[in-house]
Amino acid sequence: MVCARHQPGGLCLLLLLLCQFMEDRSAQAGNCWLRQAKNGRCQVLYKTELSKEECCSTGRLSTSWTEEDVNDNTLFKWMIFNGGAPNCIPCKETCENVDCGPGKKCRMNKKNKPRCVCAPDCSNITWKGPVCGLDGKTYRNECALLKARCKEQPELEVQYQGKCKKTCRDVFCPGSSTCVVDQTNNAYCVTCNRICPEPSSSEQYLCGNDGVTYSSACHLRKATCLLGRSIGLAYEGKCIKAKSCEDIQCGGGKKCLWDSKVGRGRCSLCDELCPDSKSDEPVCASDNATYASECAMKEAACSSGVLLEVKHSGSCNSISEETEEEEEEEDQDYSFPISSILEW
């Protein structure tokens, strides 16, 4: 651009700067997106006014780019009404320089597109047998557990070797963790020596099934571990002197069941549907009635609003000496959901 002699110097400089700005803007024009959907359009806007080189420099497989430099209204219409931005250009066409993160590898799929798939490194695993995960499920080996963690459960860990057990017998917990059995007679390994931070808000308080208020889920887990048997969560918040379930508010779709034995309420899940299975073993409940299964017992409790617990397996009329010993132990046990120990 050549400025005419009669043009003021300030105006000429302003025009030069404007041209430079437009050149820079055109070089950067484009929008960066976090993924390309199955419909071929770009979705989840990351940043506007980026060049393709800048957008694709992250190495993320799903990052995509559109060349059009459009206004905010058009972007809004694309995202809300059109299923994403058209003319979507994926940053990666092959697996070259793709960073999938730990435990994943890039592979070309049947449509010849790069995809990150779970491929954990199992070369250093010495135990080849089944393992019990923190979710209470048995996995055929540790490698299968690592794949499950990669797919949908980032917090999943091996808690002990072997199949998940119903008692703490033959359970060898690693390190300083201790075995505790929950109300469904599933054995879990928990750690006793962890330091629990003081709660930052009153919303962290929990009322245990023992009628004691705990500062947080961590404090409840620690008390459970030190006690050596389950305490369990009655409801969220500080314990109150409730006269009935009407005084207790349950969240998360739970219903209050009244424990007449100790005069306290407990929030329990009541949305479980009992399957039609002939393999279920009957149970004798705390009301001295026999139910077709533990699930049927819970269903009856939710229907009546009165807490029922398993006294022993089998009919109430068939108590063996071994069952009586188990009953004495269970009478001292407070039931609790596994979330109160592991997932809080």
UniProtKB/Swiss-Prot annotation:
Glycans are attached at N124, N288. GO terms for molecular function: activin binding; activin receptor antagonist activity; heparan sulfate proteoglycan binding. Keywords: Disulfide bond, Glycoprotein, Nucleus, Repeat, Secreted, Signal. It comes from the Eukaryota. Disruption phenotype: Follistatin-deficient mice are retarded in their growth, have decreased mass of the diaphragm and intercostal muscles. They also fail to breathe and die within hours of birth. Some of the defects are similar to those of the BMP5 mutant mice, which have defects in the thirteenth pair of ribs. Heterozygous loss of Fst is partially retained in a Mstn-null background, implying that follistatin normally acts to inhibit other TGF-beta family members in addition to myostatin to regulate muscle size. SMART domains: FOLN, KAZAL. Residues 315-344 are annotated as: Disordered. InterPro entries: Fol_N, Follistatin/Osteonectin_EGF, Kazal_dom, Kazal_dom_sf, Prot_Inhib_GrowthFact_Antg, TB_dom, TB_dom_sf. The keyword Secreted applies. The keyword Disulfide bond applies. Residues 321-333 have a biased composition (Acidic residues). Disulfide bonds join C32-C55, C42-C88, C56-C91, C95-C106, C100-C116, C118-C150, C122-C143, C132-C164, C168-C179, C173-C189, C192-C225, C196-C218, C207-C239, C245-C256, C250-C267, C270-C302, C274-C295, C284-C316. Residues 94-117, 167-190, 244-268 form the Follistatin-like domain. One of its GO terms (cellular component) is nucleus. Pfam families: FOLN (PF09289), FST_N (PF21333), Kazal_2 (PF07648). GO terms for biological process: ameloblast differentiation; BMP signaling pathway; female gonad development; gamete generation; hair follicle morphogenesis; hematopoietic progenitor cell differentiation; keratinocyte proliferation; negative regulation of epithelial cell differentiation. Interacts with GDF11. Interacts with activin A/INHBA. Interacts with myostatin/MSTN. Multifunctional regulatory protein whose primary function is to antagonize members of the transforming growth factor beta (TGF-beta) superfamily including activin, myostatin, GDF11 or bone morphogenetic proteins (BMPs). Mechanistically, binds to these ligands in the extracellular space, blocking their type II receptor-binding site to inhibit downstream signaling. Plays an essential role in muscle fiber formation and growth both by preventing the repressive effects of myostatin and through SMAD3/AKT/mTOR signaling independently of myostatin. This is Follistatin.
